[in-house]
């Protein structure tokens, strides 16, 4: 998995990351649009501003439980890494994200329009420039500076793979 160098503590390492993988599994399809993801969990209500998380970012899982997301920027950074993986390898195996036997051994491809792709890169740039302006800062404190450096590298790679 190409994004293994990013997927860990700050990107892919949160409760929101686990919830995102569960959401993607629940879609039970190979090709998933970014719009489906945004609409499915409520990120579309953020209007591409992820500094402060708008309430009610959630979905209902396959057994009927309501799963909440806490920090919009966590989801966006995870999705950026997933987009990068899909750009480089053409797909993402959900099981590789956590090497968990409970996770389906299934490949997906997340598709973004040029406008969505640009919006994600812009959101990452804003995070890199203003990490302490994000609600996640309240949770992780100054570690957000280290996260911003990782996101900076991720964004740089995304720029190499323009639509």
Where are these regions (language model features)?
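Low-complexity intrinsically disordered segments
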Residues: 117-163
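Hydrophobic core segments within long, regular secondary-structure runs in both alpha-
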Residues: 31-38, 42, 80, 111-125, ...
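N-terminal leader/targeting peptides and immediately adjacent processing regions
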Residues: 1-49
């Amino acid at each position: 998995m190409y994004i293994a160098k990013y997927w860990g503590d700050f990107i892919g390492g949160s409760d929101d990351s686990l919830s995102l993988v569960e959401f993607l599994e629940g879609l039970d399809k190979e090709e998933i649009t970014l719009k489906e993801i945004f609409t499915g969990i409520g990120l579309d209500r953020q209007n591409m501003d992820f500094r402060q998380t708008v309430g009610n970012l959630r979905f209902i899982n396959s057994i009927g439980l309501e799963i909440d997301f806490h920090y919009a920027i966590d989801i966006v950074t995870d999705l950026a890494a997933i987009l990068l993986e899909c750009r480089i390898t053409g797909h993402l195996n959900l099981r590789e994200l956590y090497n968990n036997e409970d996770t389906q051994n299934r490949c997906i491809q997340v598709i973004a329009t040029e406008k969505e792709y640009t919006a994600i890169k812009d959101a990452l740039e804003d995070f890199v420039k203003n990490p302490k302006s994000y609600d996640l800062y309240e949770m992780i404190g100054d570690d957000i500076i280290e996260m911003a450096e990782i996101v900076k590298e991720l964004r740089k790679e995304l720029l190499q793979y323009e639509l």
